[in-house]
């Protein structure tokens, strides 16, 4: 007969495995084998600053049946047609698709683009996704890769705005400008001309979770530039993501604002993992950092635009319950005034950093 101590240990071990096997977002919907019959439940599962994002919940379903693209006059059944409608829509796909957009795809507010149940690829050498002055957008279950620059040209922005000339774009996978309430979850992003995700120009209420970022140098930019004060109100949650392999820097790189980086798993980076300028507040909690082998790359953090260490001494960059391997280390600074950054609807449980590899094991598109 097993000893009471052994039994107690096994019960304790099972409790640890059970609590850490799935993160709270995945536990909310993936445990239901019939999730396809209740797709909109996903909108109840976000955590962090983007937890109020409803996307297309409560609207009609719109099914993408064609990979064709007409930037000015999209036809029904195409992704651009659904994404530019004024009405609330939950967009799904009838089959596996490889979509090469001819111009950036402007996503109107109150939309969910839900790739679950199909193998959906965007980019493929064309421009990708763009959001401006919209709210309540969910992007889930998409492979976004090979996004390229675009030229000046006419694009249908939305039904109400109509067709307008759009400046050339840099080749980001996902661009958000002055966006509120957006949730980017369970996507696989790689190999684009510029960044994978840009959150700028007063965007706030954003959660970026369960994504896989790989084979890309400049991953995630939060904040427009060092002179854009409106980004001081920016609040972004970066949680349960897998960074790497072959992710170079900006995971994320923040200007101004408040960024909570929680339970992410970091493979060795090329330049740095987390960076910033213009006094952002960066709270790193329960992440797992594995440093590169080169001794001069061991530091997780990079403060940009500081003439000296003392110039950044008051920036609030804190590491709590992070796990470090292969010599990785986080340089903390500043004093945080308030530890309760979330309201009751936004808050979620953050595990210790040693659990991050398990919590991110399903990051990216889920089959």
UniProtKB/Swiss-Prot annotation:
Cell cycle listed as a keyword: no
The record lists the catalysed reaction(s) as: Eliminative cleavage of (1->4)-alpha-D-galacturonan to give oligosaccharides with 4-deoxy-alpha-D-galact-4-enuronosyl groups at their non-reducing ends
Enzyme class, UniProt record, top EC level: lyase
Q: How is the cofactor bound?
A: Binds 1 Ca(2+) ion.
Assigned keywords, A-Z:
Allergen, Calcium, Disulfide bond, Glycoprotein, Lyase, Metal-binding, Signal
Positions of the catalytic residues: 250
Q: List the disulfide bonds.
A: 28-45, 128-147, 306-312
Which parts of the sequence bind Ca(2+)?
A: 170, 194, 198
Give EC number(s), comma-separated.
4.2.2.2
Glycosylated residue positions: 148, 178
The record's Gene Ontology biological-process terms are: pectin catabolic process
- Cleaved signal peptide residues: 1-21
Under Gene3D superfamilies, the record lists: Single-stranded right-handed beta-helix, Pectin lyase-like
- Family per record: Belongs to the polysaccharide lyase 1 family. Amb a subfamily.
Family matches, as PANTHER family: PECTATE LYASE 16-RELATED, PECTATE LYASE 18-RELATED
Q: What is this protein called?
A: Pectate lyase 1
Q: Which organism is it from?
A: Juniperus virginiana (Eastern redcedar)
């Amino acid at each position: 007969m097993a000893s009471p101590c052994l039994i107690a240990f096994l019960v304790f071990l099972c409790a640890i495995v059970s609590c850490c096997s799935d993160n709270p977002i995945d536990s909310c919907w993936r445990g239901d084998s019939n999730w396809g019959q209740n797709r909109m439940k996903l909108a109840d599962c976000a955590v962090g600053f983007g937890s109020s994002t409803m996307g297309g919940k409560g609207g009609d379903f719109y099914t993408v049946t064609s990979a064709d693209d007409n930037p000015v006059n999209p036809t029904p059944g195409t992704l651009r047609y659904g994404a530019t409608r004024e009405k609330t829509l939950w967009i799904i796909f009838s089959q596996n698709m490889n979509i090469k957009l001819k111009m950036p795809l402007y996503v109107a507010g109150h939309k969910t683009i839900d790739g679950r149940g199909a193998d959906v690829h965007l980019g493929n050498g064309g421009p990708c996704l763009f959001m401006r002055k919209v709210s309540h957008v969910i992007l889930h279950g998409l492979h976004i890769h090979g996004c390229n620059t675009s030229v000046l040209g006419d694009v249908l922005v939305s039904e109400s705005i109509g067709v307008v000339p759009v400046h050339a774009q840099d080749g980001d996978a996902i661009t958000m400008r002055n966006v509120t309430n957006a949730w980017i979850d369970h996507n696989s992003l790689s190999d684009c001309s510029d960044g994978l995700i840009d959150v700028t120009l007063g965007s706030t209420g954003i959660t970026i979770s369960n994504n896989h970022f790989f084979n890309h140098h400049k991953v995630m930019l939060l904040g427009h530039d060092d002179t854009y004060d409106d980004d001081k109100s920016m609040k972004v949650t970066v949680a349960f993501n897998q960074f790497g392999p072959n992710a170079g820097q900006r995971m994320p790189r923040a200007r101004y604002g408040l960024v909570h980086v929680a339970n992410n798993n970091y493979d060795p980076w090329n330049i740095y993992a987390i960076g910033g300028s213009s006094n952002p507040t960066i709270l790193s909690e329960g992440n797992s950092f594995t440093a590169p082998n080169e001794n001069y790359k061991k530091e997780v953090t990079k403060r940009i635009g500081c003439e000296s260490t003392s110039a950044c001494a008051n920036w609030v960059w804190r590491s709590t319950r992070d796990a470090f391997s292969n010599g990785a280390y986080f340089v903390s600074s500043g004093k945080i005034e308030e530890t309760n950054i979330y309201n009751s609807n936004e808050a979620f449980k953050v595990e210790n950093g040693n659990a991050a590899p398990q919590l991110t094991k399903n990051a990216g598109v889920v089959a």
